[in-house]
Amino acid sequence: MTAPLIYIVAGEHSGDVLGARLIHALRAINPSIRFAGIGGPRMEECGFQSLFPMHELAVMGLIEILPRVLKLRRRLQQTVQDIETRRPDLVLTIDSPGFCLRLLRAIQPFGIKRVHYVAPQVWAWREHRVKRFPGLWERMLCLLPFEEKWFAERNVPGQFVGHPVLESGADQGDAARFRARHSLADNARVIVLMPGSRANEAGRLLPVYGETLRLLMQNIPTITPVIPLASSTAHTVRGAVSSWPVQPIFITDIADKHDAFAAAEAALTKSGTSTLELAMGGVPMAVTYRVNRITAMMARRLIRVPYVAMVNLLAGREIVPELLQENCTPTKIAAVLTSLMNNAPDTNGMGAADSQKQALKAVVASLHAPNRHASDGLPSSAAAASIMEVLGQ
């Protein structure tokens, strides 16, 4: 009997991480499973060969995507042809709904089983899109606790398998190890900067981050910025920070990143999954985001949720400050970070950093799924078990 072939499509860094964990979890169930498709460096470490460089799919924003439409269309056609040629037993698409939903629709006539991992965030904006989902997949795997019910109410079966940040190791960092490895002085005050894994979003935020550091240094002269580098943005980041008043520590190792979390007094991050990663590490944070003005104007008309930071959505209130668009200024950001790093009393009389940490613990606890898919409780194992159910194995 031929070993099953699973065709995985991941379009950005976070999807690459999920894909790598899934490959490990699926091989733990059936070591003979074969893989093909599109992925990044983390999946390639598992022996995965990508059809083309994954970073070509990593673009965000209504305006930013326009110059790349033709190339993305060619890559979509190439992927469809590859799937038709290979005839895999199952196609697994991970996040990147702009590309993946078009792909799933295009391969619908092939009769191949399909699973989509990471529910499209139609609950946040353009809810009408949910009407197009029936028939696109046999199963959708949800990361967030409210999604299964939300989609079920709209006749789209989803399955909450837990959030992968729970197995990221973000809560296992060692502050002393980080300080020793990077020869930090005893009075060095660490702040983690996470401008995003897409070059366009990082390019907009880094100048703001640099000026914010300049302001922070007036009151915190020993501030020590740390930037976890993604390969997709390394060139952009290194070029942007050359004029900063203090040069950051660049880290590429995941364990080193988690050690940085443990050593950090605060973090400055873009919105998205990074907020959950920092929450797992117990790092107080401020959330920032900037996009093209036209994109922002259109998004404000379409978005139907009160917050952009995932931790705030899950908490149902603003537990971390959101500094977006016109509020994403060095002066405002520096004021928030100063309050966090000095643990200044908030309106309840609790330290700003301590208050955030307490609220973030509750958010992390909500990310655990019921133990119905995998004995070890890991989200990737639950997702792999669900995928094998679809395969009929």
UniProtKB/Swiss-Prot annotation:
Task: Identify the metabolic or biological route this protein is part of.
Answer: Bacterial outer membrane biogenesis; LPS lipid A biosynthesis
Q: Which GO terms describe its biological process?
A: lipid A biosynthetic process
What Enzyme Commission number does this protein have? 2.4.1.182
Q: Give one GO term, molecular function aspect.
A: phospholipid binding
Catalytic activity field: a lipid X + a UDP-2-N,3-O-bis[(3R)-3-hydroxyacyl]-alpha-D-glucosamine = a lipid A disaccharide + UDP + H(+)
One Gene Ontology cellular component term attached to this UniProt record is: membrane
- InterPro entries xref list: Glyco_trans_19
Lipid biosynthesis found in the keyword field: yes
Pfam families the UniProt entry points to: LpxB (PF02684)
Role this protein plays: Condensation of UDP-2,3-diacylglucosamine and 2,3-diacylglucosamine-1-phosphate to form lipid A disaccharide, a precursor of lipid A, a phosphorylated glycolipid that anchors the lipopolysaccharide to the outer membrane of the cell.
HAMAP family from the xrefs? LpxB (MF_00392)
Report the sequence similarity comment from the record: Belongs to the LpxB family.
UniProt protein name: Lipid-A-disaccharide synthase
Q: Which species is listed as the source?
A: Granulibacter bethesdensis (strain ATCC BAA-1260 / CGDNIH1)
